[in-house]
């Protein structure tokens, strides 16, 4: 989570503000986009693996994929936002091909949607660990 947060903060600083107009995303350098997308990909991988481990610990199995883990996490209340399912689609899209327009759109969604979802998920997991 920390590395994704650092990447998001670098981009926000480069653009000079937290709320971006639509064209601002196109001004982000390709290197920053690629870096943020990579950090998003492995943060997503870690997140769904933690979901899977928690679900298996709770006796829920078999969990075979990120889609299974995410669906179960929604079902048991580990996460509460269905945009996690969209996250899987974007993660698969960025892993399979690189397209500048797609990258720009995914970066926008990472900054506006997915990063906050990861932070909320981290809080949930930390709360579960304390209890």
Question: Which role fits each region the language model picked out?
Answer:
Residues 1-131:
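Solvent-exposed interaction patches of small proteins and small membrane subunits
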């Amino acid at each position: 989570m920390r590395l994704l947060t650092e990447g998001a903060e670098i981009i926000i600083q480069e653009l000079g503000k937290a709320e971006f107009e639509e064209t601002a995303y196109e001004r982000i350098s390709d290197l920053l986009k690629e870096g943020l997308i990579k950090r998003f990909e492995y943060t997503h991988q870690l997140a769904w693996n933690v979901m899977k481990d928690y679900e298996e610990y709770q006796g829920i199995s078999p969990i075979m994929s990120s889609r299974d883990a995410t669906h179960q996490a929604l079902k048991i209340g580990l996460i509460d936002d269905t945009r996690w399912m969209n996250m899987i689609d974007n993660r698969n899209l960025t892993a399979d091909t690189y397209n500048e327009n797609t990258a720009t759109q995914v970066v926008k969604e990472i900054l506006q949607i997915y990063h906050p979802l990861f932070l909320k998920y981290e809080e949930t997991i930390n709360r579960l660990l304390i209890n």
